[in-house]
Design a protein with these regions (language model features):
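N-terminal capping/lid subdomain adjacent to the active-site entrance of alpha/beta enzymes
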Residues: 1-119
């Protein structure tokens, strides 16, 4: 059975990051992990206040789908379960990563894309 874990992580920046609307000295990331005892799929997101997201609200959205993830929620089902945003991004990435590891197939291959190559 799959389980879902998620947490808020704070990373200090090496130096102050400044753009026209402000400065910040740290970045806040919400991580999601889907585990089954053998495989772990990981995803992350950066909540954006512009879209009324806080780290806590995004974490709550992710955690609310714990029972659905345990029941086998697919990437397609996720699209209907959450609106576009940071939480859906983190879980979508975690599901892609989980499926890739479980099937021992790279994500690019699952998506029907060409193998990545240097630019």
């Amino acid at each position: 059975m799959r389980t879902l874990s998620a947490e808020i992580e704070i990373y200090p920046l090496h130096r102050l990051f400044t753009i026209s609307r402000g400065s910040k000295s740290e970045t806040i990331v919400v991580t999601a992990a889907i585990l089954d005892g053998s495989h772990t799929g990981r995803g992350e997101c950066g909540p954006n206040a512009r879209y009324d997201e806080t780290p806590e609200s995004v974490l709550a959205q992710i955690e609310s789908l714990g029972p659905d993830i345990a029941a086998g929620m697919s990437r397609a089902q996720l699209q209907d379960a959450l609106p576009p945003g940071a939480a859906r991004n983190a879980l979508d990435c975690a599901l892609w990563d989980y499926d890739a590891k479980q099937m021992n197939t790279p994500v690019w291959e699952q998506a029907g894309l060409s193998a990545p190559a240097p630019l």
